[in-house]
Amino acid sequence: MSNNAADTTTPEDERSAFETAQEEQDDVDPRTIPQKLDGEPPIGEDIEYPDYPEEDHETWRILVERQMEQLPSRACEAYMKGQEALQIEADRIPSLANLSRRLDDQTGWTVANVPGLIHEKDFFTLLSERKFPSTNYVRGREELDYTPAPDCFHDMFGHMPMLTQPDFADFYQLFGQAALNAEGADRPRLERFHWFTVEFGLIREHGEKRIFGAGIVSSNEEVTHALSDDVTLHAFDPEHIVEKDDYEVYNLQDELFVLDSFEQLVEGFRNWTTQRGLL
């Protein structure tokens, strides 16, 4: 979530988990380095559909098929309903313009086509305007199980269905607004909140744990791992989440947080950010 200028040293307690992880790696994948947007990206109907090679569509089909073998019994109702509402194709890479139109019909969100991981200010600005930044390239066949940077499968299949849920959609806009006001140690705190909700969140439904985080629903390994006995679960608590700085972004998660409802997510986030003067 951070892309500091090369001549700026970030205090240790203000570094993001991604910055820390990159410092510990010998070779940094250039896809994990955020890019600054040069002007407004294409939005909605202005997004052109790429001329994908058939291999990319086949990769998409493999990814969707693998996940859909597991998700119906593990993902939350809002996610599964979101997939239906967006009519996400299983046999070919969807059109961002079409997804944007359907998303707009559901909750007033649209899609912005971005080149990859983008600078945090650009990212937060788009969220604050109810515009979801999405790539349009799909990972290579050699990265079916894991890709260090977001691709269109993670963005479309992982994130977009949840943006059809009204409370989650409102929360994500609030997140963008609060993040634009964050300074110092509040920046990595917000990154942790994002990580343990948007990316790796769980929710309790009908007495059972269900998945909604994009980092889980788009990962074949995380889907089974997240609901296994190998993971320590905590009740949703914003104060606990924002101070949890011992997680690793490039490994399976061994601790997760469980919501009781998406209304709880909105209320908890609004209360914490208001106390911090971010909203």
Per-range role (PLM):
Residues 159, 177, 202-205, 213-214, ...:
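Generic structural "secondary-structure junction" signal
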Residues 163-171:
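A structural motif
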